[in-house]
Amino acid sequence: MTQLSRILHIEDDRSIQAVAKVALEAVGGFQVLSCASGAEALAQLLAFDPQFILLDVMMPNMDGPQTLLKLRELVDIRRVPVAFMTAKVQPAEIEHYLSLGALDVITKPFDPMQLAKQVREIWTRSQNASPTGTA
């Protein structure tokens, strides 16, 4: 199994972005590219070649679900697992995010010391899944 090393984190809140970046780099040992908007992420996507995308739901101009739809046009989402991050954790909303192709939803506020572990668990699940999406 390939080892996870490159994470694209799309988050408009600079303080959350900074905490997540430090946690993922220092605790997880990942290389993290942080983008403040969906448009910025789309511009950086191909050059960075992420192995995992961590995507905020609520952002101005292009929200997380809209960004995910645009990302799908550029990369094979089955090859690049996506997890949404949100404070909106109602079951219907989570179901909607998963129906868009996200593998999981990480709730905010998050524990910085657990974030790398959560991402690694989602990554491992994605690598163990068959092409049809079942284990």
Model segments located where?
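C-terminal output helix
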Residues: 110-120
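Short, glycine/charged-rich "phosphate-handling" switch motifs in NTP-dependent
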Residues: 103
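The C-terminal output helix
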Residues: 120-135
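Acidic, metal-coordinating helix/loop segments flanking the phosphotransfer/catalytic sites
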Residues: 34-52, 69
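Conserved acidic segment of CheY-like receiver
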Residues: 3-15, 20-24, 53
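Receiver (REC) domain active-site loop signature in two-component systems and cognate sites
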Residues: 59
